[in-house]
């Protein structure tokens, strides 16, 4: 005669907590297993995604109005006329480097308003 799963469940339900603990320990030893919950593989420390705090404003093209682009670059950087002209003509060029996100976005808006193509890195 074979014992069914239902009969085993009923028999376990009638045991005290201490008897269930002893039963589990005996089953672990008999079958060489552990009743502990399976633990996911050791994942390394959670990657911390750091928000970028410093940005470079790169002008890739100056658009159709080079004079306005030169004026905007001079105003933003304090460069002289020749240096600003050389910078604008050598696109793509970093207009400002290592500035805050707010300053970078403001400068980008000014440059895009005059028709320049700008990237933030």
Curated annotation (Swiss-Prot):
Key word Ribosomal protein present: yes
Gene Ontology terms, MF aspect: mRNA binding; structural constituent of ribosome
InterPro entries xref list: Ribosomal_bL12 (IPR000206), Ribosomal_bL12_C (IPR013823), Ribosomal_bL12_C/ClpS-like (IPR014719), Ribosomal_bL12_oligo (IPR008932), Ribosomal_bL12_oligo_N_sf (IPR036235)
Keywords, sorted A to Z: Ribonucleoprotein, Ribosomal protein
Highest taxon of the lineage: Bacteria
A cellular component annotation (GO) from this entry: cytosolic large ribosomal subunit
Cytoplasm among keywords: no
Gene Ontology biological-process annotations: translation
A Pfam family: Ribosomal_L12_N
Assembly mode: Homodimer. Part of the ribosomal stalk of the 50S ribosomal subunit. Forms a multimeric L10(L12)X complex, where L10 forms an elongated spine to which 2 to 4 L12 dimers bind in a sequential fashion. Binds GTP-bound translation factors.
Function description: Forms part of the ribosomal stalk which helps the ribosome interact with GTP-bound translation factors. Is thus essential for accurate translation.
Family: Belongs to the bacterial ribosomal protein bL12 family.
NCBIfam families recorded: L12
Protein name (database record): Large ribosomal subunit protein bL12
Organism: Psychromonas ingrahamii (strain DSM 17664 / CCUG 51855 / 37)
């Amino acid at each position: 005669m074979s014992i069914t799963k239902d009969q085993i469940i009923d028999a376990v339900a009638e045991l005290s907590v201490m008897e269930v603990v002893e039963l589990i320990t005996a089953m672990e030893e008999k079958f060489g297993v552990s009743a502990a919950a399976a633990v996911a593989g050791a994942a390394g420390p959670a990657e911390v995604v750091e928000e970028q705090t410093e940005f470079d404003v790169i002008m890739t093209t100056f658009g159709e109005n080079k004079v306005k682009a030169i004026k905007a670059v001079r105003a933003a950087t304090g460069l002289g006329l020749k240096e600003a002209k050389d910078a604008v003509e050598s696109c793509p060029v970093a207009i400002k480097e290592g500035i805050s996100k707010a300053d970078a976005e403001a400068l980008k808006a000014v440059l895009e308003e005059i028709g320049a193509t700008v990237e933030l890195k």
